[in-house]
Amino acid sequence: MANLRIALVAGEASGDILGAGLMRALKAQHPAVEFIGVGGPLMQAEGLTSYFPMERLSVMGLVEVLGRLRELLKRRKDLIATLIAEKPDVFIGIDAPDFNLNIELKLRQAGIKTVHYVSPSVWAWRQKRVLKIREGCDLMLTLLPFEARFYEEKGVPVRFVGHTLADTIPLEADRAAARAELGLPDGPLVALMPGSRGGEVSRLGALFLDTAQRLRAMRPGVRFVIPCANPERRAQLEELLAGRDLPVTLLDGKSHLALAACNAVLIASGTATLEALLYKRPMVVAYRLAPLTFWILKRMVKSPYVSLPNLLAQRLLVPELLQDDATVEALAQTLSPLIDGGEEQTRGFDEIHRTLRLDASNQAADAVLNLIGQTR
């Protein structure tokens, strides 16, 4: 079996998790393999030689990106030159499309096979990016089936590999065990998940807590749990909770335990909705943006739904209350019946979970090795 040299670049923690799983699967199928590129501690533990710390790529927000733009462009230019000199058998860009798609284009022009793992949201907006993907990418690996259908229509070689979260989250979560671990009592429990970013919690935190108070008036026995993404979000939520008489348990992280423990979820639109779906917890999705941002996005977004559960179901499976529709009364009235109901949602969630549960890392490894003619 010939020695393989595989280059990978991940730009953030979620990519590091995916990359490490893919590397494990590649080694299992083709033990004589060397990994080079950029990754975090998990990928390095699997044997990646990282040219520089992954954190140098982990920037969020326009201001932060502009502040680091010169460094990012130089790192990308140097990385392209290094990889062309190293001539890997294949390059795998993991997410981070603004950084990786340009690398893929340059490497493919230099005769190196390229794979992009995790589709950017081209199906929803900025659809012209698909032209760059088609030019720079030998193979797109998608986590979600509707993404693969989009690429097929656009003539991009694609393979739907499933979602690693669907592989790791059990088909039936143990609510009683989760409550015991968190020290939460029996009775109706609602998880409030207003987002992981400061701006999201600023826009949605008070709205979600006001909704909790309204729910409490409608159903006096209901309690609440809020998983906090980090210490900053916890401090923000503690400030919003001051002066409110609400039975709320704040958790540090532990979003998966909160979802397993609860009966229903009030949740910001985002990737956490997929986790709630996989835990089969009925949900109401809410989101508010700055009015101008919402106006612009409404004209740019091509999709009829904003939440992943509805995009995956290809129908309105979960209620979406956006912008001015996201009022306390509307959220409370929509959420209340789901606390001890929501069977239609959970049936749909179970179907979707089974569709996504494909052993993603092995599927991705198969696709990569097949592309470079190294299948077993």
From Swiss-Prot:
Q: Which Pfam families does the UniProt entry name for this protein? A: LpxB
Q: What does this protein do?
A: Condensation of UDP-2,3-diacylglucosamine and 2,3-diacylglucosamine-1-phosphate to form lipid A disaccharide, a precursor of lipid A, a phosphorylated glycolipid that anchors the lipopolysaccharide to the outer membrane of the cell.
Pathway(s) where this gene product acts: Bacterial outer membrane biogenesis; LPS lipid A biosynthesis
E.C. code: 2.4.1.182
Q: Which UniProt keywords apply?
A: Glycosyltransferase, Lipid A biosynthesis, Lipid biosynthesis, Lipid metabolism, Transferase
GO biological process, alphabetically ordered: lipid A biosynthetic process
Any idea what this protein is called? Lipid-A-disaccharide synthase
- Naturally occurring in which organism (per UniProt): Pseudomonas fluorescens (strain Pf0-1)
> GO terms for molecular function, please?
lipid-A-disaccharide synthase activity; phospholipid binding
The entry assigns this protein to a family as follows: Belongs to the LpxB family.
* Reaction catalyzed: a lipid X + a UDP-2-N,3-O-bis[(3R)-3-hydroxyacyl]-alpha-D-glucosamine = a lipid A disaccharide + UDP + H(+)
Any one GO CC term of the record: membrane
InterPro entries, alphabetized: Glyco_trans_19
